[in-house]
Amino acid sequence: MGKGAIPDDWEENLGMAGMHGTWTANMAITQCDLLLTVGARFDDRVTGSVANFAPKARIVHFDIDQVEINKIVHADLSVNGDLRWSLPAFRKQLEASPIPAVQTVTWRQELQEMKAGHPAGTRPSSEKGLSPQVVLEETAKKAGPEALVATDVGQHQMWAAQFYPVSQPHHFITSGGLGTMGYGLPAALGAQLGEPDKPVVLITGDGSIMMNCQEFATLHKYGIAVKTVVLRNNTLGMVHQWQGMFYKGHFAESDLTANPSIAGVARSMGVPAWTVEKEEDLPAALDRLFAQEGPALLEVTIPPDENVYPMVPGGKKLDEMVTGGDNA
């Protein structure tokens, strides 16, 4: 939820931690000897096995909500209060007693080596569909750094967190651990009304968008210029991934091949919409999407068997990541 508070392109930003976090972020938490935590609630999507979370570290927890402190993860030191005063006070203490650079240089080098050795994995497009990672990276380039991006819930949400770079606070809008399918379109609509002069992009999937697709009519009626990118894999992708990895491939009720064309649904409500099935057609389609005045939608076919990695299986330690393949 804090994505953008620290620019994604800052070299010392290790990326998101947790179940679908980066290899480097998860290993850094596992190996560090001091963990400063600002405003986190330590939900199970971040900690993995709570008993084995940050096993070598003393934990300092800053939070405005006293209830969150020591609720899940024990803090060796806690600071309860508004970050607007607690962080500046902490900084003054650091400036008064600075840590010698020699004590941190080796660790920082190790982290950069981790990042270089374990980059985020982008799979190539295939005859089954476009690479979702490429779609998100190209969408971000076309939308520009000022764009606000909202997501629904599922694989596309995790890919957006991993591959859609954000450099400003409050520019990545998602329901986070609440897991609310259908959240994305009304969230994007509200963001566009609140920031009428900025581009607003909705990243969604063909499962989530069906939860609230009637709001296309609202976009059309009021000319709300949300640009929607639908990653269509004809499955409830995250459910399908878990069924394949942990339930012996029993793909119960996760097949969406009977769903209508999302582009067709949008057009029926007055929103211009197109489809893309080949990577060579993507740049022109994105240009057309962002050139359109008012709302518009692009439906992109991605492979149905594309999984989100890394993945920490439920209850496992953060360093027990699955980094690829078809099963755990």
Where are these regions (language model features)?
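Alpha-helix capping/helix-boundary segments
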Residues: 2, 42, 155-156, 235, ...
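Glycine-rich, acidic loop regions that bind phosphate or pyrophosphate groups
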Residues: 2-108, 286, 290
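Thiamine diphosphate
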Residues: 13, 26, 31, 69-80, ...
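Structural beta-sheet core signal
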Residues: 37, 61, 151, 202, ...
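Anionic group-transfer/hydrolysis microenvironments
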Residues: 39-41, 63-65, 154, 208, ...
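Short conserved AdoMet
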Residues: 54-55, 144, 195, 291
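Conserved acidic/glycine
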Residues: 100, 107, 112-117, 124-128, ...
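Active-site diphosphate/adenylate-binding microenvironment
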Residues: 110-191
